[in-house]
């Protein structure tokens, strides 16, 4: 097994929306550098989640090629500026933001009214200018996702009068890696892996690498317990293995994890003694935490908790 160290050799914040980090991983066996570098690059660029504005409603506007009286930018320019807005969301459900402003004024993201689950990374990010005493009203929907979300231009079918925006959720804007060989002896060659990460400020380069590694761990973890035995025994043995898994493998939020621990729920076996309704009876365990646990069980282990506890007559 290879044990390596990772060191951050350079870190800088060029602006609220630009962070950079350079890292070195060493020592690696020959061939491991490209394996790690390529896996991290693909995962970090495609799988890390971010937040973006996906739809907008502007008072008095019915299509994206309109102009707004008293506003310097037309609707299309405003949509393009909103597409660049960098956000961080602590909610998996869509959120609504708003602004109502009378001019003359400069509209920046710092003037947006957003739920507490949403963090605006750059409050000075420019959106538009109101040139006279026009009242500008706008609502926008924020969603969480990964990669790109390309949509057909036009109104959002989910909400009347909402114009859709092509959303870019990727928190990492660029990722480079290089591998350098180091000859230790005539028969031993080790490698040094250099990583360069650029982010949009919604997370740091260090966080990006950590989250990317967690995604890869979750992806490969099921392969660590392969056991091809008699098909008749497979289901029972799989169930026993699952029951022994600790709740740490669900990668829950700190709040949900602590509530389960205080309720003496330490393993999946303990958790399966509860129904969805019974989870809500745990002290300080709200609907949001229950939904998080239910989703984690389904996505990571393929287990669906019953809505209610089955009561069998004895």
UniProtKB/Swiss-Prot annotation:
The N-terminal domain is essential for RNAP assembly and basal transcription, whereas the C-terminal domain is involved in interaction with transcriptional regulators and with upstream promoter elements. InterPro entries: DNA-dir_RNA_pol_insert, DNA-dir_RNA_pol_RpoA/D/Rpb3, DNA-dir_RpoA, RBP11-like, RNAP_asu_C, RNApol_insert_sf. GO terms for cellular component: chloroplast; DNA-directed RNA polymerase complex; mitochondrion. This is DNA-directed RNA polymerase subunit alpha. It comes from Gracilaria tenuistipitata var. liui (Red alga). It is found in: Plastid, Chloroplast. Pfam families: RNA_pol_A_bac, RNA_pol_A_CTD, RNA_pol_L. It catalyses: RNA(n) + a ribonucleoside 5'-triphosphate = RNA(n+1) + diphosphate. GO terms for biological process: DNA-templated transcription. The lineage of its organism: Eukaryota, Rhodophyta, Florideophyceae, Rhodymeniophycidae, Gracilariales. Its EC number is 2.7.7.6. The keyword Transferase applies. One of its GO terms (molecular function) is protein dimerization activity. In plastids the minimal PEP RNA polymerase catalytic core is composed of four subunits: alpha, beta, beta', and beta''. When a (nuclear-encoded) sigma factor is associated with the core the holoenzyme is formed, which can initiate transcription. Residues 239-314 are annotated as: Alpha C-terminal domain (alpha-CTD). DNA-dependent RNA polymerase catalyzes the transcription of DNA into RNA using the four ribonucleoside triphosphates as substrates. Residues 1-227 are annotated as: Alpha N-terminal domain (alpha-NTD). It is an enzyme of class 2 (transferase). Belongs to the RNA polymerase alpha chain family. It comes from the Eukaryota.
């Amino acid at each position: 097994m290879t044990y390596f160290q990772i060191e951050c050799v350079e870190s800088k914040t060029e602006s609220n929306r630009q962070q950079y980090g350079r890292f070195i991983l060493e020592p690696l066996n020959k061939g491991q550098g490209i394996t790690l570098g390529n896996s991290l690059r693909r995962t970090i660029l495609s799988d890390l989640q971010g937040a973006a504005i996906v739809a907008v409603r502007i008072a008095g506007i019915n299509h994206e090629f309109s102009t707004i009286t008293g506003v310097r930018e037309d609707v299309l320019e405003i949509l393009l500026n909103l597409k660049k807005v960098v956000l961080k969301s602590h909610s998996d459900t869509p959120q609504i933001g708003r602004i109502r402003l009378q001019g003359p004024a400069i509209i920046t993201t710092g003037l947006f009214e957003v739920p507490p689950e949403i963090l605006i990374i750059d409050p000075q990010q420019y959106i538009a200018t109101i040139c006279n005493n026009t009242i500008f009203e706008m609502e926008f929907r924020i969603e969480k996702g990964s990669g790109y979300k390309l949509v057909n231009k036009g109104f959002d079918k989910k909400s009347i009068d909402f114009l859709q925006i092509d959303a870019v959720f990727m928190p990492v804007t660029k990722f480079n890696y290089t591998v350098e060989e180091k000859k230790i002896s005539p028969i031993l060659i080790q490698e040094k892996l250099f990583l360069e990460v650029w982010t949009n400020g919604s997370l740091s380069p260090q966080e990006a690498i950590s989250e990317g590694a967690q995604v890869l761990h979750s992806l490969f973890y099921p392969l660590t317990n392969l056991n091809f035995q008699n098909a008749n025994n497979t289901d029972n043995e799989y169930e026993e293995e699952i029951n022994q898994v600790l709740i740490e493998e669900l990668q829950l939020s700190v709040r949900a994890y602590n509530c389960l621990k205080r309720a003496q729920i330490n393993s999946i076996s303990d958790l399966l003694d509860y129904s969805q309704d019974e989870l809500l009876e745990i002290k300080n365990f709200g609907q949001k935490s229950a939904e998080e646990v239910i989703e984690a069980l389904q996505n990571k282990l393929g287990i669906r908790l019953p809505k209610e506890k089955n009561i069998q007559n004895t």
